[in-house]
Amino acid sequence: MAVQQVKKSRSKRDMRRSHDSLTNPTLSTDKSTGELHLRHHVSPNGFYKGRKVVDTKSED
């Protein structure tokens, strides 16, 4: 098993861990339907920036 030559200080350990935090996804409200969706993603009903960009199946 590998053994370190010099022990890492608490400061160096914490600096390495500074980028490990998690963030919540940012949600936006669709202009046409008021539905929440991920930013820069098409909403489930096919709208993006207030325009219909994807044809979705109709519920018949």
Swiss-Prot record:
Q: Which UniProt keywords apply?
A: Ribonucleoprotein, Ribosomal protein
Q: Which SUPFAM superfamilies match?
A: Zn-binding ribosomal proteins (SSF57829)
The record's annotation in Pfam families points to: Ribosomal_L32p
Q: Can you name one GO molecular function term for this protein?
A: structural constituent of ribosome
Spell out the GO cellular component terms annotated for this protein, sorted alphabetically and separated by semicolons. Answer: large ribosomal subunit
Stretches of Basic residues bias are at: 7-16
Answer whether the UniProt record assigns the keyword Ion transport to this protein: no
User: Which parts of this chain are annotated as the region Disordered?
Assistant: 1-60
Record's HAMAP family? Ribosomal_bL32
Q: State the family named in the UniProt similarity comment for this chain.
A: Belongs to the bacterial ribosomal protein bL32 family.
Q: Which PANTHER family match?
A: 50S RIBOSOMAL PROTEIN L32 (PTHR35534), LARGE RIBOSOMAL SUBUNIT PROTEIN BL32 (PTHR35534:SF1)
- The protein's name is Large ribosomal subunit protein bL32
The protein's organism comes out as Francisella tularensis subsp. holarctica (strain LVS)
What gene is it encoded by?
rpmF
